Amino acid sequence: MQVLQTPLDIAEKYKTIKNAGVGSERLASKILPIRDFNNWAKMAVIQLCYNYQKSRDISVLDLCCGKGGDLNKYARLGSVSYYAGVDITLHSLIEAIKRYNQKLCELNKNRKFGQPFQADFTLADVMSAPLYKHFQKTKFDMVSCMFALHYAFQSKQTADAFFGNVKNLMAPNGSFVAVFPCKDTILKRLQEQGADLSQGNLVLKNSLYSIKFPNAVNFKANLFGQKYIFDLDEAVGDTAEYLIDMRDFRELCSQNQLTIKHHFPNLETLLQTDQIPQKAKQNFSNMMKRTAKFIFLLNQNLNKGQKMTDDNFWDNIDEEQIDQINENQIQKITDLGQLPEEYLEVIRLYQAVMVVHTNPAEVKSCEKIRIPVPEARRAIDICNLTKEPINLETLRDEFKGEMWEPSVWM
């Protein structure tokens, strides 16, 4: 088993993962309920941050933006004027540019889906690069890091670098939101299955995911670098991740004059709390429509006595079958309890936080970025903060047969 440990290892891995979040491939995905719920959860915390903004001319910094999966969420806010996406994976940024150009075209044609906004993309390791030096004349109203913050806790040095970027790039009345695994939840599950936490070779798993601690870890200590190996079917394969001890998180916030405004110990609480905007809650069932159809087919197989681990269990759960299901046949998803336990075990691994400046009045402000006519982006527009040059010819060859668009390459 090859374990991915460095940012470049992880970048190489994500380069090979196809666009499971787009189009028909997603409808046939085993982890569709997880993807749909996580998308709703991200939208909910993004709207929470948005509601704290006094201005309606918002700038966004998306750290570890990947393939730009959250671009549409920000577009739907209707008030974003500038978006900056940063990621260590060049191939993901190419996909993000394609997605942005498509969204810009849609918004120019129909403003009811939001207003057009300018986007820039930067190739950088957000866990080490001093991004505030690159964006030295810019501060952002909303800063996000979705499902990636745990990589920053590999060491005190990487965590310091990350939180330094957040502190220096967040506007005085801005907010930072992150979703990441919950250490307490992981330890509680290990204890419930009778594991000796002082030993190595600890494992949590079901048919969809696994968490493995190959070496003994001092879980009681709030030490950096508490490594485990995470695998999620169709999404993340045998990747080294790091537990985030909330004592460390709070200490890092304190050192950078930041304060936790909201903490949601697991994502399920987003549906229950009054802190999440009602608009987001009302959209939950709509965003889970595909999952409702998927669960309908899945339950048919389970009711026949089949198990999710059976070789032929997934044979009839494909895009064509899902498309054929009439909405009158299905039960709307209004509560997470309607999902099978395998999916809930994964969803309940994660928590969310919203962080703000402790003393906003002491934070130096910057002028807003104003771009009258947003323009499409190309691969050549990517700002490269790594030591490796970008070879456009090689990129074209690697994407051959998958994507060739003048709006991206020319």
Which residues does each predicted region cover?
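A short acidic, Gly/Pro-enriched loop at the edge of an enzyme's catalytic core
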Residues: L131-V143
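Class I SAM-dependent methyltransferase Rossmann-like catalytic core
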Residues: V3-Q53
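Conserved beta-strand signature within the Rossmann-like core of class I S-adenosyl-L-methionine
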Residues: N173-P181
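C-terminal lobe and adjacent flexible extensions of AdoMet/dcAdoMet transferase-like proteins
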Residues: N218-M410
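A short glycine-rich, Lys/Arg-flanked "PGG" loop and its adjoining helix->strand segment in the class I
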Residues: T158-P172
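Conserved class I S-adenosyl-L-methionine
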Residues: D57-G66, A84
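A short SAM/SAH-binding and catalytic strip from SAM-dependent methyltransferases
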Residues: F140-Q157
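Class I SAM-dependent methyltransferase SAM/SAH-binding core
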Residues: G69-S128
